[in-house]
Amino acid sequence: MIIMISVILVNPKYSGNVGSIARVMMNFGFEELRIVGDKSIINNEAYMMAVHAREILDNAKFYNTFDEAIGDLDFVIATSGARGGDRNLKRVPITPKELADKILEVKGNIGIVFGREDDGLRNEEIDKCDLLVSIPTSEKYPIMNLSHAVAVILYEIYTKKVRNKFLDINMREASKEDKELLIRKFNEFIDKNEKIPEHKKELCKIIFKRLVNRAFISGKEAWTLMSAFK
């Protein structure tokens, strides 16, 4: 793949799910599986469900903590079955299709994080990610099986990659450092602006960070915006 995307599982409970995810990854051309948790999750059941994707399990990387699993990544995407709304600006998700439309523009190492089967990702884990994705499902039963959720998201990314096989990206995507500097400049600008009420400043910072991460801006655009916040 042109872009490096890791699938990250946080404390998975069922070996069968891990094996099924390995199979799905191979179906759609993804190679790196990262697991936060114990190596014992990969057992005979996992290999049985993986079928011909054993090498994905053999090469899986294990981490003790969430922070370690995402530490070397440039862009991290959280997944959640619980949707945010207009009143919850920290949890405004995009759909897998919207993610696929954007993700091929990203340069660097990307991680897509999937939470625990029973209660998903914790809020503090989601807050450490750059983007939140949620799969539209029926309100009667919105939470999907873990391996099915992985399949939906990887399918959308793969089909978009196929449709855009010869896509040429002319502008360099803003690096992680570019974005962090832009956000820091904006935060400093907000802190110094006496016209903005104190109780709204933190909200402005949260919204701007989300906008920057959702927009996939170029390096040139990031530096142009920075000049406005001096």
Curated annotation (Swiss-Prot):
It comes from the Archaea. SUPFAM superfamilies: alpha/beta knot. Keywords: Cytoplasm, Methyltransferase, S-adenosyl-L-methionine, Transferase, tRNA processing. Its main location: cytoplasm. One of its GO terms (biological process) is tRNA nucleoside ribose methylation. The keyword S-adenosyl-L-methionine applies. It is found in: Cytoplasm. Signal peptide: none annotated. One of its GO terms (molecular function) is tRNA (cytidine(32)/uridine(32)-2'-O)-methyltransferase activity. GO terms for cellular component: cytosol. Belongs to the class IV-like SAM-binding methyltransferase superfamily. RNA methyltransferase TrmH family. Catalyzes the formation of 2'O-methylated cytidine (Cm32) at position 32 in tRNA. Homodimer. This is tRNA (cytidine-2'-O-)-methyltransferase TrmJ. The gene is trmJ.
